[in-house]
């Protein structure tokens, strides 16, 4: 099992990244929360990972924190939620926001994540209740990397999460100018939930 990778970030192409660890390039899918908190290409990075072996593929998923990985592991245990859907959920909300939504039984908020309908959201509440803990302080490992055009990056992230261009552009209007991309995505998603 590959539990953690430490090396040089050599490629960033949402939602995939490549980390060079002693001459071996590891390709991993990451949540948008993690992606926008990665350092620039060429810098050192550390990710917690989850390797999923299927009949047709070996898939590696990367996370900024051990807590995010733990949440991912709980999500993929829920019936109807696969690895890609779990990653989409963690792109739409932080692990703490997910834990809070489950604790509050907020089906509407959960079903706003891409690929999650009302029934799956209800199943998430039932199966995850008591298993996720919200933390008031998150332990991010990376400094936020400023984007050249944050608005475009936020819109493209929302499009990657399955929202329409109209919804994405409307949601970005409520994000204050100068907000970094990671925080901008969170604020835009909150605007979409209103």
Swiss-Prot record:
Homotetramer. Forms an RuvA(8)-RuvB(12)-Holliday junction (HJ) complex. HJ DNA is sandwiched between 2 RuvA tetramers; dsDNA enters through RuvA and exits via RuvB. An RuvB hexamer assembles on each DNA strand where it exits the tetramer. Each RuvB hexamer is contacted by two RuvA subunits (via domain III) on 2 adjacent RuvB subunits; this complex drives branch migration. In the full resolvosome a probable DNA-RuvA(4)-RuvB(12)-RuvC(2) complex forms which resolves the HJ. The lineage of its organism: Bacteria, Pseudomonadati, Pseudomonadota, Betaproteobacteria, Neisseriales. The gene is ruvA. It comes from the Bacteria. Residues 1-64 are annotated as: Domain I. Residues 65-143 are annotated as: Domain II. The keyword Cytoplasm applies. One of its GO terms (cellular component) is cytoplasm. The RuvA-RuvB-RuvC complex processes Holliday junction (HJ) DNA during genetic recombination and DNA repair, while the RuvA-RuvB complex plays an important role in the rescue of blocked DNA replication forks via replication fork reversal (RFR). RuvA specifically binds to HJ cruciform DNA, conferring on it an open structure. The RuvB hexamer acts as an ATP-dependent pump, pulling dsDNA into and through the RuvAB complex. HJ branch migration allows RuvC to scan DNA until it finds its consensus sequence, where it cleaves and resolves the cruciform DNA. Signal peptide: none annotated. GO terms for biological process: DNA recombination; DNA repair. Keywords: Cytoplasm, DNA damage, DNA recombination, DNA repair, DNA-binding. HAMAP family: DNA_HJ_migration_RuvA. The keyword Cytoplasm applies. GO terms for molecular function: ATP binding; four-way junction DNA binding; four-way junction helicase activity. InterPro entries: DNA_helicase_Holl-junc_RuvA_I, Hlx-hairpin-Hlx_DNA-bd_motif, NA-bd_OB-fold, RuvA, RuvA_2-like, RuvA_C, RuvA_C_sf. Residues 147-194 are annotated as: Domain III. Residues 144-147 are annotated as: Flexible linker. It comes from Neisseria meningitidis serogroup C (strain 053442). It is found in: Cytoplasm. This is Holliday junction branch migration complex subunit RuvA. Its main location: cytoplasm. Belongs to the RuvA family. Has three domains with a flexible linker between the domains II and III and assumes an 'L' shape. Domain III is highly mobile and contacts RuvB.
């Amino acid at each position: 099992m590959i539990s953690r990778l430490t090396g040089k970030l050599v490629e960033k192409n949402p939602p995939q990244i490549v980390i060079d660890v002693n001459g071996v390039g590891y390709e991993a899918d990451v949540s948008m929360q993690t992606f926008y908190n990665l350092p620039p290409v060429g810098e050192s990075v550390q990710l917690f990972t989850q390797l999923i072996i299927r009949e047709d593929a070996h898939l590696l998923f990367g996370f900024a924190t051990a807590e995010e990985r733990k949440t991912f592991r709980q999500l993929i245990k829920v019936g109807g939620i696969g690895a890609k859907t779990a990653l989409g959920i963690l792109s739409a909300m932080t692990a703490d926001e997910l834990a809070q939504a489950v604790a509050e039984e907020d089906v509407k908020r959960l079903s706003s994540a891409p690929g999650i309908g009302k029934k799956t959201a209800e199943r998430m509440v039932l199966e995850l209740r008591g298993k996720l803990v919200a933390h008031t302080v998150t332990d991010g490992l990376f400094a936020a990397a400023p984007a050249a055009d944050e608005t475009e990056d936020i819109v493209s992230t929302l499009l990657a999460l399955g929202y329409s261009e109209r919804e994405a552009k409307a949601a970005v209007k409520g994000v204050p100018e100068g907000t970094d991309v990671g925080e901008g995505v969170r604020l835009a998603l909150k605007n979409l939930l209103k």
